Amino acid sequence: MIQVLLVTICLAVFPFQGSSKTLKSGNVNDYEVVNPQKITGLPVGAFKQPEKKYEDAVQYEFEVNGEPVVLHLEKNKGLFSEDYSETHYSPDGSEITTNPPVEDHCYYHGRVQNDADSTASISTCNGLKGFFTLRGETYLIEPLKVPDSESHAVYKYEDAKKKDEAPKMCGVTLTNWESDEPIKKASHLVATSEQQHFHPRYVQLVIVADHSMVTKNNNDLTALTTWIHQIVNDMIVMYRILNIHITLANVEIWSSGDLIAVTSSAPTTLRSFGEWRARNLVNRITHDNAQLITAVHLDNLIGYGYLGTMCDPQSSVAITEDHSTDHLWVAATMAHEMGHNLGMNHDGNQCNCGAAGCIMSAIISQYRSYQFSDCSMNEYRNYITTHNPPCILNQALRTDTVSTPVSENELLQNSVNPCYDPVTCQPKEKEDCESGPCCDNCKFLKEGTICKMARGDNMHDYCNGKTCDCPRNPYKGEHDPMEWPAPAKGSVLM
């Protein structure tokens, strides 16, 4: 079994005293300055990895408010799909699509040692940038732009002042609300076992950046792509509680000009985007959902998405305004709009996630959480039960969604799949399958079980009792109009 190289970073902490300063993420009232010092070492019994720019596992040690913190991170190997691609356009409008190597990337997930409720989403591309939770509080870390310095700022999520304090809203409804329920810290919010149990679903995502995003990033396509990667890395953490696994299939950048009319009218723009996706994007890229990100200021909104439309070729879409210099805020907004696609409506004041506002809050406020409420969980469960969108049933890729095996350290493993041993990276004994429409609780469903309901004059598809995928009914015609998009095959454990 391959061992990973552990890297410990000792951070000297110097609290900043004085008035607020402007960081890249906005005006911050108070932050601590930390200076990373990289120390490498191997745990007992570990073998040195082949040379990589970014280690599979890293640790950072520092202090927050005088409290020592050990941050354990593991590379997010489920971030990119197997055939991940990037698309941009030449000045004459010609499409250019490439498949860049992404195995040795710089995006991590993790936790804080001795805090079971903690989580983290960090990029190490250019310094440390991202968020982590500690004792129910959310902290952000980002590099300070100081010449010849490796200093970073660490500050609380709510300490970041936004330039525009006016409420920002989602366009699905125009209902403002403020929670009048007692606020509980996230560490005190315990979901029931029923709430915590969701069958896994797999969303292959495409992010499309319009030309305003290119202009906003000074025509730097690399910087724009990195921004999108950070957003998706955050979204994956947010959807983990629903057992939804998001993989990024493609980033499309309209570098030579918009391919639709992008205006301040979110409904009009989204309608055009959905039509473009149905006639263009679905024929080029295998995916389940597409999100448009724009720097155009939408009319009194920051996002808009269709409700309960996952897998629909035209309506499995949403639009998000790039409204913040903090990627966590933008990620929460995009997660919100995708939540609509997955059947979740806006939260009411009876909904609870342990914060003043949850992901599906109708408005975004300074204290908005990146967690789904109990109401959202119930609405998602109802949507999956009644609609069961077929395109997200099957795992797109097995090898990239299981972490490199790690032992003799405290790093978290990918343990969300009960059919798979995350420590040995081997199938559990006596199990038939890992996932798929004909796989349930690690066993093949019985022959004759319906795995795809008929629509109109079509015929049902049935499990054969031998595979985890849903075999096409041989008595169907040559073309089944409902077979879009073609689902990926499930993973069978041999």
Curated annotation (Swiss-Prot):
Cellular component annotations (GO), alphabetically ordered: extracellular region; plasma membrane
Peptidase M12B domain span: 201-396
Superkingdom to which the source organism belongs: Eukaryota
Subcellular location as annotated: Secreted
Assembly mode: Monomer (disintegrin).
Motif residue range(s): Cell attachment site: 455-457
Tissues with expression: Expressed by the venom gland.
Family in the record: Belongs to the venom metalloproteinase (M12B) family. P-II subfamily. P-IIa sub-subfamily.
Signal peptide range: 1-20
The organism's taxonomic lineage, starting at the top: Eukaryota, Metazoa, Chordata, Craniata, Vertebrata
Name of protein: Zinc metalloproteinase/disintegrin
GO biological process: proteolysis
Domain Disintegrin: 417-478
InterPro entries given in the database record: Disintegrin_CS (IPR018358), Disintegrin_dom (IPR001762), Disintegrin_dom_sf (IPR036436), MetalloPept_cat_dom_sf (IPR024079), Peptidase_M12B (IPR001590), Peptidase_M12B_N (IPR002870), Reprolysin_adamalysin (IPR034027)
Molecular functions (GO terms): metal ion binding; metalloendopeptidase activity; toxin activity
Keyword match Disulfide bond: yes
Misc note: The disintegrin belongs to the short disintegrin subfamily.
Pfam families from the UniProt entry: Pep_M12B_propep, Reprolysin
